[in-house]
Each structure stands twice: as C-alpha cells, then as structure tokens.
Amino acid sequence: MSERIVLHIGAMKTGTTFLQTTLERNSALLSEAGVDFTGNRFAYQTRAVSAALKGAGEKGRRYRRWRRLARAARQSEQDVSLVSMEFLSFAEDPQIRQLLKPLRGLQVDIVMTVRDQFLVAPAQWQTHCRNNGTSDWGTYLRQIEPRLAGRPRRNDAYRTFHRAQDVDRTLQRWATFRRVGDVHVITVPGRDAPQDELWKRFFDVVGVTPPPVDFGVAAPNTSLGYGSCDLLRRLNEHLGDVSGGRYRKGMRQLAREVLAQRRDLESRPVLDRRGAEYARGLNEQLRESITRNGYVLHGSLDDLPVPASLEEYDAKPVPVPELETRAAAEAAWDYLTDRAGAKGGKRPTSLDALVLEDARLLREVHGWS
C-alpha cells in the first residue's frame, strides 16, 4: 500500500496541462515505475477537488469524492500516489485542513510548478479573454497591478490573476500544516530547453526514474494569437448573460476549431516597460520566497529572470493590429454561419458590426437565449 502521496497544487499556466495529459495517458507505465496516478484520470481528480472547494453544501458531502480519492491512494499497490490539480492552490486554511484529514498516516509532500512572470501575464490575459473577460491587453496590465487595483473592491482581473499566481502565499498556507512533509518548487524551464526537462524535474520530486513516454500525445493548452484573444474579449461584451458552463462549452469549441488554427498567422501580446517592471518584481519575490523558506528547488532560479535593464520594452503596450482581430472575426463568422445553416448571407463590413453578428450567431448555434 502507498505510504506517500504527492500533491501537485499548481500554479496555473505552468505546464500543468502538459504534465496532467502525459500522466493520464501513461498511467500503465507509471504503475510499472511504482507510481499511482490516482484514479488514472485527470477528470476524476478534478471532480474530487472541485467538489471539496465548493463554498455551498454540507461539509461531509462536499468532501465525499475527495475521501474516495484518498482511500484509493491508500489502497494503491504502488509506492507513491500522485494527484495533480491546480485548483488545490485556491484552497484556504479550513479547506486544506479538510483535504489533509483523510490522508492521515501518509507522507504528504507538496509540489508547485512556477514560471517566469514575463510569460505568465500574457497567458493569464488569454485566460481572462476565454472566461468572460472584457479588458484589452493594455487595460489588463494596469488592472493586475496592486497599486491601481482599486480599494476596497478590486477588479476581477486582479482577483483572478493573484488568486492563480500568488505562489508565496499559497505555499505558506500549505506548509504551515504539520501533516505536510516536504514542500517542493519546480521552475518551468525556458522555451529552448529539451521537451522532457519539465518531466524530469517533476519526477525528481516523485522520487523515481521518469518513465520513457511519447510526448507527442501530450496536449498542451491550445494557445491563441493576439487578434483571436481580442476577438474573444470583444464578444464577451455581448455575452455577459450566458451562464458559465454553457459559455465555456461554446467558446472552447470556437477557440479549438477556428481560432487556434490562426495562431501562426497572428502576433503575440508583449509587455510594456511598466508591465515588465512588475513581472521582474514578481520574479524577484518568487526567488526570495523559495530561498527564504527553504523549499526544495528543482530547476534553477535563473528560470525566473531579473534583468537589470528593461530598455527593450516599449513605453506603452503595443495595441492589437485591427486586421488581426478582423480576420479572426471573419473566420468565426464563416464557421458560425455554416453551423447555423445560414450560408449566402452578407458579412458585415465594420469590425463592431461583425463582432455583434458573431455574438448573435453564437447564441443561435448554441441555443443561448
């Protein structure tokens, strides 16, 4: 039976999808290496964690799925059980206490993957655009800065960014519990690193030789270009009444089947100098936190750069090229008119009218009244 469980608690936008997909699709190889990816499915772990973190409902019922997961981990014939679910980083003290209870008797180690904040901010803006957000890139950069977030009520962009990326606070919350053993931090290697480097670092934490897997089957998050993200946030201005689950299903389909195909045709949002100063400061805070608290580091602090000069960054954010947004909106219109069986219509000429028509077609195709 397992005597140790490793909880990979995030953070978001740090290679979690790559790791989770690879773990799930190679669960048999993991078993041969002495590792149990508990439940063998990421969806199983997601449901257990999501139910436990819900604010409403009777406490015992909320944690029922998590207790089942804990029981499965205990009963595993492997040496180590492994759970990877970034929503665990959202848990507050009372929730962490409840999550740890059924793991009593197991060695519980925590691991968090962290990434260069110069890359995280654009990735988080994309998440903002794909989840009802309406802020353009330049506005978003200012909104996530604490000094301009507003008091006493901070904006949604600020809340979601810092909820996902406040690594120091997250690790300190978990580390204060006596049932937590070692706390590990993995720095995500740079873009030029070998494809398997993050995998190797992850299995340094697990404590076994990483099994040889086919990374070709791993499914990283489908990233979008600048114009497509701008289209989504413009569409969101007309879809604020669509409920979360229905919204996500329809918009993910549009992103996957249409907008992701345009990625190589579009530019990327780039930090301005002030945004770069903020990212540099966040990297510096991460480095200090890892060193100060004595977390077990896998990788290098150099993966969290603190450049002396930021002269390469423009004074103001580079706006999205309107032609990119228009081309993305036209591609969406072609796709949606085909889905709606409305071929032969005339495409609107102005960008605002085209976005409005795309929003109307989304409602028609998905039954969003």
Please annotate each region the language model reported.
Residues 1-369:
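Anion-recognition interface
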